[in-house]
Amino acid sequence: MRLRDDFVAVKVPATSANLGPGFDSMGLALDLWDEVSVHATTGATSVVVEGEGAGNVEQGEDNLVVRALRLALDRVGAPQVGVRMHCTNRIPHSRGLGSSASAIVAGVTLARALIGDADVLGRQEILEIGSQMEGHPDNVAPAVFGGATVSWMNEESSEVGSVRLTPPEGISPVAFIPDFELRTAAARAALPATVPHGDASFNV
């Protein structure tokens, strides 16, 4: 398999997940977008980041977008190349808007665009690779499919599925973005291991 294009660009939305009772399953795409472009090269990989995360995110092979691109190319047996990547980030990092899922989906989608074959790396494969890297599909699915999604993942078989829902017209999300960062792992660690039956029922 070869790469058909040497310059591609994608944009991926922010997402909000863990909606209502849908912990690790329900997510919503938002009208806030990261844009990423890639030139395939024979040289070393370089990453330029503008906006959110500039000066803080990795700028070489350890960059999350690059890692997702590499994994996707490996998965379909496509050749690895050097990349010159430019990221315009508008999604705040570590503030609950799915920045890591958006970066992963951007990387896999860039791989698909470089390959240039509509039959390779379809949306289901993007969902699978993204969920594998992210650990759960709740932010990945709305970043891939748009709208609202209900998703699930079998941890034993790694099978991933998602159903897309169209939100009612006239509903506009409002995001309250804190002025501090909180990593997902730390936020999850603050949650109790179990929830009382009454609380779970009330949340539904």
Can you say where each PLM-predicted feature lies in the sequence?
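ATP-binding N-lobe of GHMP and related small-molecule kinases
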Residues: 1-95, 113-119
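ATP-dependent small-molecule kinase catalytic core of the GHMP/sugar-kinase superfamily
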Residues: 119-204
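Generic beta-strand or strand-like secondary-structure segments
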Residues: 64-71, 106-114, 125, 129-132
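Gly/Ser-rich catalytic serine loop of serine hydrolases
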Residues: 90, 94-102, 138
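DPxDG-like acidic metal-binding loop motif
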Residues: 32, 97-120, 143-149
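Short, charged, solvent-exposed linker or helix-capping segments at domain edges/interfaces
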Residues: 46-49, 97, 184-189
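A general structural signal for well-ordered alpha-helical segments in protein cores
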Residues: 62-69, 104, 173, 184
